[in-house]
UniProtKB/Swiss-Prot annotation:
It comes from the Eukaryota. This is Large ribosomal subunit protein bL20c. Belongs to the bacterial ribosomal protein bL20 family. GO terms for biological process: ribosomal large subunit assembly; translation.
Length: 115
């Protein structure tokens, strides 16, 4: 059986893992085995939190819309239902930005919806 020399491949792999772990604290950024474990954990956390971020922002938009609609005597569910009946197709993100940044435009939306 022939001898397999993998020094370059192994070094490249270890260097790649240690580069990914460069911002970690303590031995997690210096020792290969702990760095490998921590990078796997960090990558799984980052994947999970990218999904969670979407849910949290959606909840934030709903909360903002509910607060803004209550100033005009509506709640979020009635506001959304009346928007749908009026044929206004704006998503939660855009509606919350309008409510936050442009009070007059949001008030016009409320007047359209209330009638």
């Amino acid at each position: 059986m022939t001898r397999v020399k993998r020094g370059n491949v192994a070094r490249k792999r270890r260097k790649q893992v240690l580069n990914l772990a460069s911002g970690f604290r303590g031995s997690s950024s210096r020792l290969f085995r702990t760095a490998q474990q921590q990078t796997m954990k960090a990558l799984s956390y980052s994947y999970r939190d990218r999904q969670q971020k979407k849910r949290e922002f959606c909840g934030l938009w709903v909360t903002r819309l509910n607060a803004a609609a209550r100033l005009y005597g509506l709640n979020y569910t009635n506001f959304r239902h009346n928007l749908k009946k009026a044929g206004i197709q704006l998503n939660r993100k855009v509606l919350s930005q309008v409510a936050l940044r442009d009070k007059q435009a949001f008030e016009q939306l409320i007047l359209l919806v209330k009638d």
